[in-house]
Amino acid sequence: MKHRLLLLSAVAMLVMTACEKPKMEVYPRCFSVSETTQVFFSPGNLQYDGTTKKYSFAPTQMTVIGGANRNISDTYGGAIDLFGWGTGNNPMMSSTVGTDYATFVDWGSKMDEPGWRTLSFEEWNYLIQKRPNANKLYGSCAIVNIMGGKDFGMVILPDTWDCDTIDVSYSDNFLKHQYDSELWKKMEKAGAVFLPTAGDRMGNSIAISSVGNEGRYWSSTPITDGCAHYIGFGDFVNEESDGTLRSHGRSVRLVKEITSPSQIPAAK
């Protein structure tokens, strides 16, 4: 009888172990976007050069193009960083009709380096709301440069953030959390991501007041014909966007999935 009980106990343990979800390995300077997927972010917002016909990343996480996005056209030779939804194959598209953007072509698929992609809305939502300690790992903030100027945006911290002396708990006020350039360098080296307030474009019109005050970042998720999900923030964080017309020009921040430590970029 005793042996039978021990055998039943062992079988029960095996069944319980088999039913447990495998734990995802947590990598440094990376971000969970689901229970099974970690990513790292590109070093800056996506840009497109009308002369070279090439995509690239902004030179810093704070860099935005601003009002020059209004020049968008098939013949424009300058750079833009506000894109209609899913325009990876036609970044200079400026139609104001949402249904003209019927098919999502990921900008990441057009990068010279493979593997880049756009987060889905579900992944954005998991990153900001559902991962462990989510409300302590993002918030509106200001990066203060050496001249005293302020770059407003949203900071997002990696899963393994361990700089407890730096307050980055959720805030809906840019000025509550201000980081000088030296502190920001340390945060960035530890994996902090900054999404700048690059503004919003519609056709060839851009509200200048939105540049430096509002951030709108596309997801890959459509809603209905002509509309798609995005994440938006200003002196607020609106991670539960109901969506907007696909014809809006919005920011793009690409990611890469991590499956081994060798894929993680070296800390700068």
Functional labels for PLM-detected ranges:
Residues 11-13:
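Repetitive helical segments and hydrophobic/amphipathic motifs
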Residues 20-22:
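Bacterial signal peptide processing site
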Residues 15-18:
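C-terminal motif of bacterial Sec signal peptides marking the signal peptidase cleavage site
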Residues 2-8:
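Sec-dependent signal peptide recognition
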Residues 24-268:
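Conserved positions within compact, well-structured domain cores
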